[in-house]
Amino acid sequence: MKGIILLLIFVVGLARLEAHAFLERADPGVGSTIQTSPSEVRIRFTENIEPAVSSIQVFDASGKEVDKRDLHLDRSDHALLHVSLPQLGAGIYKVVWRVVSVDTHVTSGNFTFRVLR
């Protein structure tokens, strides 16, 4: 029995070491429609992030980058990244992210959100 418990602890530990940072939640939400322009995009990941080698970009429908290029890590939550936005007009916006977790694994993805006015 003791051997099985030690094996489980070892396997769980290895799984944690091999963890990747995946999108856990975003604000604005993935595929969401919101009434007015958000002031920023916030993405929380499943693992802590290395902000110096990570990115979040926001593009309008024409492909122009519209974020303020001021990506920063949340002071109290090192799995949460923010990027500021100017006042956005009505339309569909694409968020493209690429992050490196503290264990050096790279993940990336994208999603859209829609602003009504």
Q: What label would you give each PLM region?
A:
Residues 25, 70, 82, 108-112:
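Well-ordered beta-strand positions in beta-sheet-rich domains
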Residues 13-25:
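Proline/serine/threonine-rich low-complexity linkers at boundaries of modular beta-sandwich domains
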Residues 34-36, 40-47, 104-117:
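Extended, polar beta-sheet/loop recognition surfaces of beta-rich domains
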Residues 4-13:
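Bacterial N-terminal signal peptides
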Residues 84, 89-98:
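A glycine-anchored, Pro-Gly-centered beta-turn/N-cap motif
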Residues 30, 36-37, 89-90:
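Surface-exposed loops/turns
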Residues 41, 47-69:
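Short, surface-exposed alpha-helix to beta-strand junction/turn motifs within ectodomains of secreted
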Residues 76-82:
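Aromatic sugar-binding surface patches on proteins
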